[in-house]
Amino acid sequence: MNLAPSTCLLLLFLLDIAQALPVWDEEGHEEGHEEGDGDDFVDITTRILTSNNNTDQLLLEGDLVAPTNRNAMKCWSSSCFWKKASNGLVVIPYVISSEYSGGEVATIEGAMRAFNGKTCIRFVRRTNEYDFISVVSKTGCYSELGRKGGQQELSINRGGCMYSGIIQHELNHALGFQHEQTRSDRDSYVRINWENIIPASAYNFNKHDTNNLNTPYDYSSIMHYGRDAFSIAYGRDSITPIPNPNVPIGQRNGMSRWDITRINVLYNCR
């Protein structure tokens, strides 16, 4: 039986909504959702910037460690990416500091498992590998951009960063991904309200010569700033989506479908 035109339009509308939703895990839970988290409307950027407020680490864009050996905002060469094994998997060794509790370790490793099954990325406990991520609890949530070489720290502060969405965000930085709103084509999708931004923090909104991997701008990306990042005052948005200013940005739960697609494209996952 043929579907009525109105029914077809409804199905297309629902499909469009579904494409913007965060990814769900195999148990049917929303990836990155924190059980019992009462502050459900705080976006990832706000949590990260709040946690990083007192850090003495030199950071770019709020949570990227400023490197000394390359252009911070350029991670296109193969030396910046983690190597793929002959079996097609990108194995990234890690160690987790003993200062974390068992529950905190479970949260960190649960965020790492969000990459399994949907990408070729595999975070594995380090044995004796030279390149590895060291997860530590310093003052703030931050990461290197891409593979640094040797030991590289990824800070997940026990007090302010212990959320799966934040951990996935920082792991994406470690894979080589930048913030969504710094894309070279961002001016077609968001308006930066410079007058509402703390002057000393305005550099965090500079555009970069990014490799967009032939993917569309993603308002729902876990790598997108919230609308009031680095704002001078409550209610003074620093970022406004265009043409529809009501489009949600700065979600807090987990990787979007385009986040996952980009990992698969960048690392040539099969």
UniProtKB/Swiss-Prot annotation:
Zn(2+) binds at H169, H173, H179. Its EC number is 3.4.24.67. Residues 71-270 form the Peptidase M12A domain. Binds 1 zinc ion per subunit. Residues 21-70 form a propeptide. CDD domains: ZnMc_hatching_enzyme (cd04283). It is found in: Zymogen granule. GO terms for biological process: proteolysis. GO terms for molecular function: metalloendopeptidase activity; zinc ion binding. Glycans are attached at N53. The keyword Disulfide bond applies. It is an enzyme of class 3 (hydrolase). Residues 1-20 form the signal peptide. It comes from the Eukaryota. It catalyses: Hydrolysis of the inner layer of fish egg envelope. Also hydrolysis of casein and small molecule substrates such as succinyl-Leu-Leu-Val-Tyr-|-7-(4-methyl)coumarylamide. SUPFAM superfamilies: Metalloproteases ('zincins'), catalytic domain (SSF55486). Pfam families: Astacin. Disulfide bonds join C75-C80, C120-C269, C141-C161. Keywords: Cytoplasmic vesicle, Disulfide bond, Glycoprotein, Hydrolase, Metal-binding, Metalloprotease, Protease, Signal, Zinc, Zymogen. Its cofactor is Zn(2+). In medaka the hatching enzyme system is composed of two distinct proteases, the high choriolytic enzyme (HCE), of which there are two isoforms, and the low choriolytic enzyme (LCE). Participates in the breakdown of the egg envelope, which is derived from the egg extracellular matrix, at the time of hatching. Thus allowing the newly hatched fish to swim free. HCE binds tightly to the egg envelope while it exerts the choriolytic swelling action. PANTHER family: DISCOIDIN, CUB, EGF, LAMININ , AND ZINC METALLOPROTEASE DOMAIN CONTAINING, HATCHING ENZYME 1.2-RELATED. This is High choriolytic enzyme 1.
